[in-house]
Amino acid sequence: MITDPLPAPRAILFDLDGTLADTAPDLAAAINLLRARAGLAPTPYDILRPTASAGARGMIGASYGVQPGESGYEALKDGFLNNYEAALAVESRLFDGIPAMLDGLSALGLAWGVVTNKAARFTDPLVGQIGLGAAGCVISGDTMPHPKPHPAPLLEAARRLNLAPEDCWYVGDDLRDIQAGRAAGMRTVACAWGYCGPVEPQHWNADHLLDTPQALLELVSTVVKAAQARQLAA
């Protein structure tokens, strides 16, 4: 069976927590500081880390067993977020291979941007402090009326880059990332190097499942160069 060649992307969009950056240490520190101030023992890091992509909801759920809408949640959320805002880039770092991958995308002539559900009060200072200041666009969880898995943030990112959604790929480590990307009409990549949460990424129906940032760069490079070769042969 003959299949159409894969169109080359013009931009790669990324989730932030668990995709570009390992922010779990600072998120865990913020929730455990809240516990310490209440005289409670810390929640083990290996329990907190897998929930990092879910932000406050994940941290509070894992540490206190309290969910949004339940009694006490909003007070816990306020305390956690205040702690996090005061120390959001102490231990957070880009994952190994991310800087080289981003440089490689730029060398291929591709734009790249960040689309996260993290609120702008945290996103804006964080991206500057951990080395993501060159992003072509940064869309936070409160930039649009609806966060992911709604497609609106991804569509806004494409608009800001002056690109059609189908010219963009979206890379994330959570099921909602893949749902948002598909709803926006973008090709989707699940990154297995991230936190990934309770549902295994092979069940997310992503177009690609990759283990390393280098694998992403290699895939994009192959697709871009194949498209360039087709243009030359036309």
Language-model region placement:
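Asp-based, Mg2+/Mn2+-dependent phosphohydrolase catalytic module
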Residues: 1-10, 106, 120, 124-234
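N-terminal helical cap/lid subdomain that shapes the substrate entry/recognition surface
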Residues: 5-100, 106-108, 121-124, 132
